Amino acid sequence: LVTYEAPAPEPVHMQTEEVVMPEAPLSAADLYLEAPRFVGLENYSEYEIEMLTRVTYAEAGNQSEYGQRLVVDTILNRVDSERFAGDDILSIITAKNQFDCVTTGAIYCYPEWDSVRWLVIEELCDRTNSDVIAFRTSRYHSWATPAFKEGDHYFSI
């Protein structure tokens, strides 16, 4: 019987560096601004991103990612449209009787979910649909042109 003795492993030499943490945590928007695909995000405040995330989750948290993106696009398209009062995210979101979660105050009961926040930030930089302006769960709005149904929502243009 032949036996073989393995050589002793070489000692591992680790080089260590001191990690310097920033004084204040960076916001998600600050981190995303460093990536080229998030060009344009600097046009939105942290509060606008938070509120858009909250409305998206409250209105479409149980829908597909695509359905959630369409809700974000609905709000952004209203900002760009002359058909709606308001020319920024907050004025569109808080307009009277436009979003149930704002009208009832439920927007403040939902946490700000990271997965939806990522999606909101991506949509702020590159929209999925630039035509949708309205949605509801039971049927199409009578004042807009029916377009398609995604999940539980009927979207109009």
What is each residue range found by the language model?
Residues L1-T16:
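Gram-positive cell-envelope targeting signals
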Residues V19:
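Alpha-helical and His/Cys-centered functional microenvironments
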Residues P22-I157:
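Bacterial extracytoplasmic/cell-wall-associated proteins, especially those involved in peptidoglycan
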